[in-house]
């Protein structure tokens, strides 16, 4: 049996330099190789003409550059593109490209499904299978960057920002998310500014501390409720890491970070008559008073079977005004890609659920239906 080849997309620059040293080559070859892969989208070692033939032969024998394939894509009326990415064994994750006037953001997945069970999120209802590898995470960026590059006649902009806000909880896959983000930031990788790479978390506090020690990127935190009682229902990880503990972890991260410019983004999905009252706005403002932040109010994007509805514009407006009375910076997120189920909370993919969460839900729904009938 032939030895399995090393997928170079699994290695950041430190890993590539170690590989070249082990091969008896100069470490700077890693810089050359990364430039070919990430700046030019090249996968054929023979095309890398500033690398000598002997080394190219060594690389061909031992290594490969393999990104997960794009299975299909849909384009929204607003220009948003949702990609289905094949990660093997009949499973897909979803990646979303969001073009704007001054930037183009790619929303990247970190897990096949999600290990958390946020009750307002479509991904969470699909259950969980596994963590994505480094090559499967950075491969989403690589594939879409090449797709956009080959589709220049359509006018899509190159990727300027990456947000780890797709399927999964990034901080439950730090071992692979950190090297992938290293490649995004590396001058020989995608060369993105640390302020243009954002990781989002629902509150896995010990992992947030580890991230702060390893990397400096922008942070977005999923709060979604102004108190523990409601957050225990909406974001069940809160039962393990309640708000006070989460906010303390956020402040520790801010203290270490330059990328956040002294504050984080608070994500708050607006659920009709669940978390959107003026009293809850006052409660949220008081909760966040000691944590430097800007608050991103996200109109809920319904999905089939969702138990929640979207807050009305008037309720969102009232909620926003209360927060601003406390001197908080508030942004109401513009919904993008909802006509192709690419908006926040709508990503589902194709998952073999190891948790059996979706099957249990279907069983419960069928039992309810039988009872009603």
Curated annotation (Swiss-Prot):
* SUPFAM superfamilies per the UniProt record, alphabetical: Radical SAM enzymes (SSF102114)
Q: What is the active site of this protein?
A: 94 (proton acceptor), 344 (s-methylcysteine intermediate)
Keyword Iron in record: yes
Predominant subcellular localization, coarse grouping = cytoplasm
Q: Can you name this protein?
A: Dual-specificity RNA methyltransferase RlmN
So which cofactors does this thing need? [4Fe-4S] cluster
Pfam families attached to this UniProt entry: Radical_SAM (PF04055), RlmN_N (PF21016)
Question: Which residues are in the Radical SAM core domain?
Answer: 100-339
Q: What else is known?
A: Reaction proceeds by a ping-pong mechanism involving intermediate methylation of a conserved cysteine residue.
Its encoding gene is what? rlmN
Q: Which GO terms describe its cellular component?
A: cytoplasm
Give the E.C. number(s).
2.1.1.192
As to how many cofactors bind and how, the note says: Binds 1 [4Fe-4S] cluster. The cluster is coordinated with 3 cysteines and an exchangeable S-adenosyl-L-methionine.
Q: Where in the cell is it found?
A: Cytoplasm
Q: List the disulfide bonds.
A: 107-344
| Similarity comment | Belongs to the radical SAM superfamily. RlmN family.
Biological classification of the source: Bacteria, Pseudomonadati, Pseudomonadota, Gammaproteobacteria, Alteromonadales
């Amino acid at each position: 049996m032939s030895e399995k080849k090393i997928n170079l997309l699994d290695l950041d620059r430190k890993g590539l330099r170690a590989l070249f040293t082990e091969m008896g080559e100069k470490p700077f070859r890693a810089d050359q190789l990364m430039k070919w892969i990430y700046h030019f989208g090249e996968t054929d070692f023979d095309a890398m003409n500033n690398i000598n033939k002997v080394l190219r032969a060594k690389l061909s024998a031992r290594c490969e550059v393999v990104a997960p394939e794009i299975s299909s894509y849909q384009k929204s009326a607003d220009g948003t593109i949702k990609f289905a990415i094949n990660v093997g064994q009949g499973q897909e994750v979803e990646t979303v490209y969001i073009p704007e006037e001054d930037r183009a953001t790619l929303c990247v997945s970190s897990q096949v499904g999600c290990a958390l069970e946020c009750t307002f999120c479509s991904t969470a209802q699909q259950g969980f299978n596994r963590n994505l590898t480094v090559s499967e995470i950075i491969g989403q960026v690589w594939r879409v960057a090449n797709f956009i590059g080959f589709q220049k006649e359509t006018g899509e902009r190159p990727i300027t920002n990456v947000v780890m806000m797709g399927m999964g909880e990034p901080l439950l896959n730090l071992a692979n998310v950190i090297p992938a983000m290293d490649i995004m930031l590396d001058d020989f990788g995608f060369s993105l500014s640390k302020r243009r790479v954002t990781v989002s978390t629902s509150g896995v506090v010990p992992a947030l501390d580890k991230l702060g020690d390893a990397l400096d990127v922008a942070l977005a935190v999923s709060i979604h409720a102004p108190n523990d009682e409601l957050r225990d229902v909406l974001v069940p990880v809160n039962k393990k890491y309640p708000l006070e503990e989460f906010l303390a972890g956020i402040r520790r991260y801010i203290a270490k970070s330059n990328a956040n410019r002294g504050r984080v983004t608070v994500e708050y999905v607006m659920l009709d008559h669940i978390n959107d009252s003026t009293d809850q706005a006052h409660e949220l403002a008081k909760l966040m008073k000691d944590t430097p932040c800007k608050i991103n109010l996200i109109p809920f994007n319904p999905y089939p079977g969702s138990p929640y509805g979207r807050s009305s514009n008037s309720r969102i407006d009232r909620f926003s005004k209360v927060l601003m009375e406390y001197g908080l910076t508030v942004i109401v997120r513009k919904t993008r890609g909802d006509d192709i189920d690419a908006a926040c909370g709508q990503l589902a993919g194709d998952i073999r659920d190891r948790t059996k969460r979706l099957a249990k839900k279907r069983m419960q729904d069928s039992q309810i239906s039988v009872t009603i009938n």
